[in-house]
C-alpha cells in the first residue's frame, strides 16, 4: 500500500496557500518560486510507485568499496534511454560519513558514460544537467555561452546562471541529455530503504547523509508531468576496470579512420575501441597524473568522420576524453611524444619543436626548443634530475633544464630513442648500437655489444617510439631489431654483467609473425614482456604474446581481425610514491647541510631515479633556506631557531610531501681562537673550505690537535 505520509510531508514543506498561484519550494535544497502546478507534478512523480523497486543484488555497475551500500537512480524525460530509469550502486565504509554529493560524484567519476553539469552555490551542490553516453564513444563536450568545455571526472563545473544556455554537444545517437528550461528541472528524491516509496527531498544532495541500503534518485520534471518513476528499471552492466591490464594504442588505418585504443584485462579479455576518434595515426601514449596523454600525428584522418586531436587527454579511471588539442604550437607540427615534468607541466615533441603543455589548463603554454634542421622529429624524451634529455630523431640529443626551459647542451649523435634503467642511468639507441649517457660530462659513451648483436631498429622515416625499453625489476634494457619495418628480433642487455644476448627470434616463426612498429614493452610491476605480432603482411591478423623475463611464452591473446596497426603498449599507473622518514636536520648559522634524497622515495611502478624532488615550502625562511638540485637537498642555516622544510616527491605526475624538521644553532661567538681543553689549534678554514692563517670575520672552522673540529664565528 502506498504510504500517505509522503503526501502529507510534501504538503507541509510547501510554502503555499491553497488558492495561491505561485509557491516557493526547495529544488535540490535551493528555494525557488514556481507555479503551484509544478509543485503538484513533483508529488505525482513520487507517488507513481509504492516502493523504489530496486534490488541491490541486481546492481552491477558500482563505484567505491566498503560494507555499506546505496543505490542511484536517474530518469531522463522525453523517452530518452527508452524511458527507463538507470540504476547504479555506491559503496563506502561504515566508519565514514557520506553524503548524497559523495555518491553522485563517485558514480559519475567511475562511469565513463555518465556525466553531469553542476555547481556549488549558497545552498550546496546543485545539479543542472545529467547526460548519458549511450553509444559509448566517450566523446562529450558542453557548449556554454562563451566556450566548448570538457568534463573533469565526468563533471562540467559551471555557474548555475549558465545552466539554461548550455547544451551537451558532440554526442551520438541514443545519448541522453536534460537541462533546466523554464520550470523543467532535475528533482531530487530519496528513500531510506529500497522497499520504501521515494520522497521528494527538501534538502540538497550536500546535506543528505547516506544510510546503508538507501536510495537517491533524480528525475527530470516536464511541463505535462508525464515523466514519473514507474518501476521500469535498467541495471547497467559492470564497467571495465582499467587498472589491472594493459592498453594498446593503435595507429588506425591511414586514410580510413582515426586512431583508437584497445584494452587487455588481466584475465585476457579484450575491450575494443574503448577510446576512439583520437586523431590520425596514434603514435605515443603515457600515464601521468591520473590521466593518459595520447599523441597523434594529426588531428583528423582523411577518412574519419570526426576531428580528434594531436593531443588527447583521457581520465585514467574511465578513459573518458577530457580534452583534445588539435594544433600544437604556432607552426602546427605533427604530434610525436610526451614527457611529464611535474604535476603541472609536460613537454610534447612534434615535427617542429618541443612545446610546454600546461597540465592544469590543458593547453600549450610555451615553445621550449626549435632547430634550423629540416625534416626534424622530436621523439622520445626522459627526465632525470633537473634535466630532460630529448632525442631529435636520428640527429641530436638535447639537454634541457626544466626549471626555465633552457637548452643546456646539444650532443651530436644519431639518437633515435632513450630510456632509463633501474639503476637510474640513461641509454640511447643509435644507428650503430647502444650508448650510455654520461650525465656528468653530458656525453654519449658507446657500449660494446659483442658479435651477433644487432643495432636497434628505427622507424626509417615513419616515426614511432621504437622498441627500446627497460625493466623496473631488473637492471636490464631491451630493444627490437630488424632489417625492415617489421621487427623480427628482441635483444637483451644485462647492465650489471655488461652482457648482451638474443632473447626472442621471429625469423623462423611458423606463422611468419613479426612485431609491428614499437609494440614491444615491459610491464613495470610483473616484469612480463608484451609483444604484438602481426601475421605476414596481412596487417589484420594480430596476436599479443606475453613472455616471462627469460623469454618463456606465458600466454597468447588474439585480437579481432581488423586493420589495427598496433603502435605501443601503455601500462596503468596504479601506485603512488611512498616516502620514508627523513632524519631531522641540524645546522649552524651559515652552514649548509646536504641530504641525498635519491633513495628516500619509491614507487612500485616507476624508476626511483625518475621521481622528481623539489622544495614545496620552508616554514620560516628567516631561520633556514632550502633547495633541491639533481636530487640533493641543501639546507642552509640563516639564524638560530627551528623551522620545517616540506619536500615534494612527484612520480608519474602524482605528488606526495614529507616534512623535515630543521634546527639552526648559533655557533660559539668569539673574537679570537678558543681551544679545547688540553688541545691546540692546528688548522683554520674559511666557510668556503679555503685555508686561512689567522681569524677572519664570519664563520671559521678550526681543527685541534686532539682531532676535534669546531665552528666559530669571529666578529
Residue locations for each model-derived region?
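Repeated scaffold domains used in trafficking and secretory/extracellular systems
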Residues: 278-289, 330-343, 373-385, 412-423, ...
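A short beta-strand micro-motif common to beta-rich folds, especially ectodomain repeats
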Residues: 633, 639-653
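Short loop/turn segments that connect beta-strands within beta-propeller blades
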Residues: 265-267, 315-319, 358-362, 401-405, ...
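A short beta-strand motif characteristic of beta-propeller blades
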Residues: 267-277, 320-329, 363-372, 405-411, ...
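Structural motif
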Residues: 255-262, 302-312, 353-356, 395-399, ...
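C-terminal outer-membrane/trafficking sorting elements
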Residues: 665-715
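Ubiquitin-like/PB1-type beta-grasp interaction modules and other compact soluble beta-rich domains
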Residues: 21-240
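Blade-level signature of beta-propeller repeat domains, shared across WD40, Kelch, NHL, RCC1
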Residues: 535-575
Amino acid at each position: 500500500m502506498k504510504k500517505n505520509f509522503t503526501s502529507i510531508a510534501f504538503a507541509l514543506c510547501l510554502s503555499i496557500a491553497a488558492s495561491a498561484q505561485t509557491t516557493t519550494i526547495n529544488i535540490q535544497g535551493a528555494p525557488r518560486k514556481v507555479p503551484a502546478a509544478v509543485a503538484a507534478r513533483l508529488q505525482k512523480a513520487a507517488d507513481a510507485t509504492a516502493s523504489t523497486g530496486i534490488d541491490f543484488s541486481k546492481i552491477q555497475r558500482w563505484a567505491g568499496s566498503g560494507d555499506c551500500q546505496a543505490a542511484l537512480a536517474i530518469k531522463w524525460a522525453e523517452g530518452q534511454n527508452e524511458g527507463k530509469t538507470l540504476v547504479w550502486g555506491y559503496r563506502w565504509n561504515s566508519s565514514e560519513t557520506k553524503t548524497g554529493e559523495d555518491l553522485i560524484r563517485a558514480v559519475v567519476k567511475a562511469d565513463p558514460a555518465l556525466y553531469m553539469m553542476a555547481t556549488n552555490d549558497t545552498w550546496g551542490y546543485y545539479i543542472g544537467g545529467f547526460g548519458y553516453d549511450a553509444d559509448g564513444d566517450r566523446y562529450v563536450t558542453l557548449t556554454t555561452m562563451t566556450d566548448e568545455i570538457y568534463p573533469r571526472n565526468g563533471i562540467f563545473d559551471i555557474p548555475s546562471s549558465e545552466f539554461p544556455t548550455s547544451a551537451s554537444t558532440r554526442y551520438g545517437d541514443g545519448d541522453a541529455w536534460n537541462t533546466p528550461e523554464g520550470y523543467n528541472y532535475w528533482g531530487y528524491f530519496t528513500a531510506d530503504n529500497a522497499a520504501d516509496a521515494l520522497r521528494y527531498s527538501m534538502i540538497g544532495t550536500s546535506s543528505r547523509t547516506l544510510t546503508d541500503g538507501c536510495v537517491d534518485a533524480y528525475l527530470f520534471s516536464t511541463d505535462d508531468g508525464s515523466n514519473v518513476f514507474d518501476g521500469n528499471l535498467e541495471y547497467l552492466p559492470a564497467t571495465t576496470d582499467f587498472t589491472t591490464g594493459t592498453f594498446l594504442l593503435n595507429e588506425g588505418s591511414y586514410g580510413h579512420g582515426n586512431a583508437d585504443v584497445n584494452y587487455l584485462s588481466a584475465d585476457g579479455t579484450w575491450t575494443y575501441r574503448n577510446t576512439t576518434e583520437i586523431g590520425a595515426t596514434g603514435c605515443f601514449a603515457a600515464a601521468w597524473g591520473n590521466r593518459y596523454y595520447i599523441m597523434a600525428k594529426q588531428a583528423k584522418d582523411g577518412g574519419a568522420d570526426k576531428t580528434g586531436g594531436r593531443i588527447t587527454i583521457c581520465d585514467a579511471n574511465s578513459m573518458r576524453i577530457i580534452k583534445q588539442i588539435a594544433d600544437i604550437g604556432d607552426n602546427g607540427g605533427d604530434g610525436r611524444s610526451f614527457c611529464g615534468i611535474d604535476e603541472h607541466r609536460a613537454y610534447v615533441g612534434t615535427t617542429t619543436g618541443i612545446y610546454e603543455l600546461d597540465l592544469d589548463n590543458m593547453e600549450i603554454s610555451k615553445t621550449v626548443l626549435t632547430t634550423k634542421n629540416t625534416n626534424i622529429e622530436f621523439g622520445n624524451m626522459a627526465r632525470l634530475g633537473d634535466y630532460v634529455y630529448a632525442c631529435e630523431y636520428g640527429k641530436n640529443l638535447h639537454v634541457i633544464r626544466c626549471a626555465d626551459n633552457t637548452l643546456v647542451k646539444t650532443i651530436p649523435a644519431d639518437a633515435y630513442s632513450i630510456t632509463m634503467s633501474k639503476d637510474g642511468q640513461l641509454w640511447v639507441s643509435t644507428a650503430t648500437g647502444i650508448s650510455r649517457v654520461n650525465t656528468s660530462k653530458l656525453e654519449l659513451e658507446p657500449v660494446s655489444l659483442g658479435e651477433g648483436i644487432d643495432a636497434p631498429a628505427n622507424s626509417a622515416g615513419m616515426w614511432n617510439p621504437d622498441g627500446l625499453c627497460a625493466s623496473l625489476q631488473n637492471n636490464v634494457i631491451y630493444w627490437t631489431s630488424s632489417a625492415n619495418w617489421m621487427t623480427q628480433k628482441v635483444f637483451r642487455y644485462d647492465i650489471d654483467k655488461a652482457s648482451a644476448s638474443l632473447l626472442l627470434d621471429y625469423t623462423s616463426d611458423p606463422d611468419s609473425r613479426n612485431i609491428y612498429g614499437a609494440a614491444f614493452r615491459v610491464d613495470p610491476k610483473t616484469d612480463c614482456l608484451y609483444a604484438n605480432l602481426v601475421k605476414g603482411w596481412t596487417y589484420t591478423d594480430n596476436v599479443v604474446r606475453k613472455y616471462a623475463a627469460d623469454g618463456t611464452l606465458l600466454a597468447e591473446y588474439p585480437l579481432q581481425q581488423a586493420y589495427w596497426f598496433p603502435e605501443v603498449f601503455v601500462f596503468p599507473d596504479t601506485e603512488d610514491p611512498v616516502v620514508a622518514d627523513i632524519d631531522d636536520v641540524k645546522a649552524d648559522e651559515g652552514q649548509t647541510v646536504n641530504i641525498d634524497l635519491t633513495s628516500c622515495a619509491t614507487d612500485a611502478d616507476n624508476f626511483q631515479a625518475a621521481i622528481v624532488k623539489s622544495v614545496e615550502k620552508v616554514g620560516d625562511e628567516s631561520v633556514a633556506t632550502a633547495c633541491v638540485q639533481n636530487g640533493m637537498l641543501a639546507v642552509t642555516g640563516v639564524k638560530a631557531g627551528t623551522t620545517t622544510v616540506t619536500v615534494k616527491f612527484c612520480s608519474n605526475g602524482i605528488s606526495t610531501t614529507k616534512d623535515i624538521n630543521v634546527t639552526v644553532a648559533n655557533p660559539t661567538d668569539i673574537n679570537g681562537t678558543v681551544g679545547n681543553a688540553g688541545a691546540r689549534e692546528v688548522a683554520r678554514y674559511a666557510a668556503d673550505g679555503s685555508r686561512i692563517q689567522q681569524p677572519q670575520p664570519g664563520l671559521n672552522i678550526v681543527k685541534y690537535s686532539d682531532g676535534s673540529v669546531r665552528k666559530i664565528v669571529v666578529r
